[in-house]
């Protein structure tokens, strides 16, 4: 018994493009759920590995901050969101992300979305080319 497998070049290209779409979706900053201290629009607690969202008080990393402390830090941080602020609350130092960092975050997310949409378009073109 002989097993014959027909491999078409168009199918290989289609699978490669589909793989690129999946990889770009998983590792794109637009779809990533990773919280990075250097590119997160929230409060970064230096030396503790803790990151706190300004709006929801959600804490990521090794955080154990009481809610009233988080609220007081957030109120100070949101007043002057366009500059670096160093606030002392006990031993906690807060750094608010600057405007240039925020623009960089937006641009990197838009770039990730553009790459994702380009891969979708490329996969559609290859699919229509293969099935014409």
UniProtKB/Swiss-Prot annotation:
InterPro entries: BNYVV_TGB3 (IPR010470). Keywords: Host cell junction, Host endoplasmic reticulum, Host membrane, Membrane, Transmembrane, Transmembrane helix, Transport, Viral movement protein. This is Movement protein TGB3. Belongs to the benyvirus TGB3 movement protein family. It is a multi-pass membrane protein. One of its GO terms (biological process) is transport of virus in host, cell to cell. Residues 33-109 are lumenal. Its main location: host cell. Residues 1-11, 131-132 are cytoplasmic. The chain crosses the membrane at residues 12-32, 110-130. Signal peptide: none annotated. Participates in the transport of viral RNA to the plasmodesmata. TGBp3 most probably contains signals of plasmodesmata targeting is therefore involved in the targeting of TGBp2, and viral RNAs-TGBp1 (RNP complex), to plasmodesmata. Can gate plasmodesmata and increase their size exclusion limit. It is found in: Host cell junction, Host plasmodesma; Host endoplasmic reticulum membrane. The keyword Kinase does not apply. GO terms for cellular component: host cell endoplasmic reticulum membrane; host cell plasmodesma; membrane. It comes from Beet necrotic yellow vein virus (isolate Japan/S). It comes from the Viruses. Interacts with movement proteins TGB1 and TGB2.
């Amino acid at each position: 018994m002989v097993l014959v497998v027909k491999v078409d070049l168009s199918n290989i290209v289609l699978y490669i493009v589909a793989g690129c779409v999946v990889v770009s979706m998983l590792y794109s900053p637009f779809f990533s759920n990773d919280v990075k201290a250097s590119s997160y629009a929230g409060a970064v607690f230096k030396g503790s590995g803790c990151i706190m969202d300004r709006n929801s008080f959600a804490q990521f990393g090794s955080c154990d901050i009481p809610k009233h402390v988080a609220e007081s830090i957030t109120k100070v941080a949101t007043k002057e969101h366009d500059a670096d602020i160093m606030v002392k609350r006990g031993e906690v130092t807060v750094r608010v992300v600057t405007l240039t960092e925020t623009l960089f975050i937006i641009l990197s997310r838009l770039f990730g979305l553009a790459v994702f949409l380009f891969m979708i378009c490329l996969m559609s073109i290859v699919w229509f080319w293969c099935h014409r």
